Amino acid sequence: MERPELPIGLPEDIEEKKAAARSWFEGLRDTICASFEALEDELEGPLSDQEPGRFVAKDWSRENGAGGGGRMSMMEGRVFEKVGVHTSTVHGEFSPDFRAQIPGAKDDPRFWASGISLIAHPVNPNVPAVHMNTRMVVTSSRWFGGGADLTPVLSRRRTQEDEDSQLFHKAMEIACRNHAVADYDAYKAWCDDYFFLKHRNEARGIGGIFYDWLHSNEDAGGWDADFAFTRDVGRAFSMVYPKIVRSNFNKLWTEADRDEQLIRRGRYVEFNLLYDRGTIFGLKTGGNVESILSSLPPVVRWP
């Protein structure tokens, strides 16, 4: 989708709005981490004789005098081979070559951004990988963006008719349909277009939703309406993905399933390093490299 021209100007209470968004993202992080640790405790199938995983949190600050930082929460366990749930709140100035790409930054390079980002790579190939992020960005304008998408790693499960796909899509649809500022059909199509490996002519997963530059006018509810929708995206994800994990994590798998999982993870690596907007944004704004690249799976294979 082509980037729109957003209105210039910020509300008088923008600092309060920044604080509210940051608080939400950090609270959602804690909720999701607790939920994922509970899944580690509940496992009864393969690998249940191993110790359940626990998140290890590491705070970081931007270097070279740039402002802000974040918390990187990583876990390696018996359900999740690798999962990262990260929050960050950063501010500073965009580099000259990056300003033209960002709404409201052409004439004033200052920015502030806060958000949550999550990628989970489960052990069991029957459990799909998942990605979710939501964020608020402020320049001389302001907007929300984010989304969530599901990546089954087994070809027999990587269909729109699969029960996991149906459950995930329904959760995202409800999150959108409850808000007039959201356009589910457009966000679903945007996700399909965004998470596509052009060099392979194939989708990364089964989709979900993706949105950016959400800046509603006051007649439509303004910032409050955009923030309410963004919160519901996080809530929907935090409820639906654990359901999907529970329905699959006790199933048996074969070596062939594991091989297929590792090959599919290779596609994840290719997308994140070649196309992912969040990865590029983080690296160009002095983000934490370890946190940014933690989205990459722990073990990968290319045929």
Curated annotation (Swiss-Prot):
It is an enzyme of class 1 (oxidoreductase). It is found in: Cytoplasm. Keywords: Cytoplasm, Heme biosynthesis, Metal-binding, Oxidoreductase, Porphyrin biosynthesis. The keyword Signal does not apply. Residues 268-303 are annotated as: Important for dimerization. Its EC number is 1.3.3.3. Pathway: Porphyrin-containing compound metabolism; protoporphyrin-IX biosynthesis; protoporphyrinogen-IX from coproporphyrinogen-III (O2 route): step 1/1. Its main location: cytoplasm. Substrate binds at residues 117, 133-135, 286-288. GO terms for molecular function: coproporphyrinogen oxidase activity; metal ion binding; protein homodimerization activity. The active site is at 131 (proton donor). PANTHER family: COPROPORPHYRINOGEN III OXIDASE, MITOCHONDRIAL (PTHR10755), OXYGEN-DEPENDENT COPROPORPHYRINOGEN-III OXIDASE, MITOCHONDRIAL (PTHR10755:SF0). This is Oxygen-dependent coproporphyrinogen-III oxidase. It comes from Rhizobium leguminosarum bv. trifolii (strain WSM2304).
